[in-house]
A protein has these predicted regions:
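Beta1-alpha1 glycine-rich phosphate/pyrophosphate-binding loop at the start
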Residues: 1-10, 31, 112-117, 124-125
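Active-site/ligand-binding neighborhood in enzyme catalytic cores
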Residues: 46-51, 56-182
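Dinucleotide-binding Rossmann-like beta1-alpha1 core, especially the glycine-rich loop
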Residues: 5-80
Length: 183
């Protein structure tokens, strides 16, 4: 999609390649060189910029004086490095951890969901909440994968090179059921 100035934009945000699978990374590297990029997202929550997904840095910014105690409880309950779905925290027996989950849901997840899906959270399958976990770490990166980046010239040229193979025939406007045979 192009904006009013003719600039290509991603209406749903940039598509960033990320994997920890070396075989996948090496395979795709045959078709592109990479612009290494580590995606970090911040949200403006009540006038303060905080990392998303919510992590221990965000916890300290959001809860200030209570953060140290909450951090201890989170680490004791889930372990350092864990990724905890928001609903898990919202249903926790400990009231403070429940409060963390509710804070993330009300101040980050609701807005993320409406922007991402164009729907209210209650209209989305609850399993989707796992996509925006609370990270029990200080890693501000959006992805934890070893390999992250963007194809140097974009995804289209990378896929064009992949499809330019003697064993691949590209068929447009074709129903798969018309050409595939299931045995």
């Amino acid at each position: 999609m192009k904006d009013e100035h003719g600039i290509l934009i991603h209406p749903y945000g940039p598509h960033i390649f990320h994997t920890s699978n070396e075989v996948v990374f090496e395979y795709l590297s045959r078709y592109t060189t990479w612009r290494h990029f580590r995606h970090e997202v911040v949200a403006n929550v009540h006038g303060e910029y905080m990392p998303v997904p919510f992590n221990l840095t965000t916890l300290e910014k959001a809860f200030k004086t209570e953060a140290a105690r909450m951090k201890e409880k989170l680490i004791a309950a889930y372990g350092m490095g864990a990724k905890v779905p928001i609903l898990t925290l919202m249903n926790h027996e400990d009231e403070e951890l429940k409060r963390v989950g509710k804070y993330v849901y009300d101040n980050i997840y609701v807005y993320y969901t409406m922007k991402q899906w164009g729907k209210k959270p209650e209209e989305i399958d609850p399993a989707v909440t796992a996509r925006v976990p609370v990270n029990i770490s200080y890693d501000n990166g959006y992805f934890a994968d070893k390999y992250q980046g963007l194809p140097e010239h974009g995804f289209t040229p990378m896929f064009e090179k992949m499809l330019n193979h003697e064993n691949i025939e590209v068929r447009l406007n074709t129903e798969a059921k018309d050409i595939l045979e299931i045995k």
